[in-house]
Amino acid sequence: MRKLLCALTVMSALVIAVAVSAAAPGNFAGTWTLDKSKSQGLSPRMQNAESVSWVITQTEKEITIEEKVTGGNPPAGGAPGGGGPGGGGQGGGQGRGMGGGFGGPRTFALDGSETSGEMGGGRPAKFVRKATVSADGKTLDLSSKVTFQGPDGEVVSTTTEKLVLAADGKGLTVTRHSESPRGTQDSTLVFNK
């Protein structure tokens, strides 16, 4: 009987330890301001902007990122660049990504499932997004794929972002890789709360 009780106690402790180790995502929510002096590979729009910020809202189930760019002129001869990797919500994101110039909030499910939908605007498009949370909850890997019809056929833009929350929760580093018909862009964005 004692052996059974001891075994049950050990099993219960293991179950509790596993449950605690499956960390929830860190708190990425808040308004984050880009520190251009610490960031690398910024687009001309971001370099010339008066300010760039991310407004992140987060619940247990999802995270939404809205990029806001104030000031700064679009690059000559093209659509504005340097915003988020394709929007996909209705509303006011002013940044435009390399992949087709779609602004607006981007929402990702935090359970690891894909989010898909359609975007309106000048070029109707389809998007697929996925978020993966690290075991410690301090890193979030985001992937986005936007597909739309261009004058020469289907255009695809993909973006991956690794969001790393600082230990004190006051810094956010984003490593971004984007690919589109305009080329490949790698950048590191450093934000402060």
Residue ranges and their predicted role:
Residues 1-7:
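Positively charged n-region of N-terminal signal peptides that target proteins for export
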Residues 7-18:
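Bacterial N-terminal signal peptides
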Residues 23-193:
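PEST-like low-complexity, intrinsically disordered acidic/proline/serine-rich tracts
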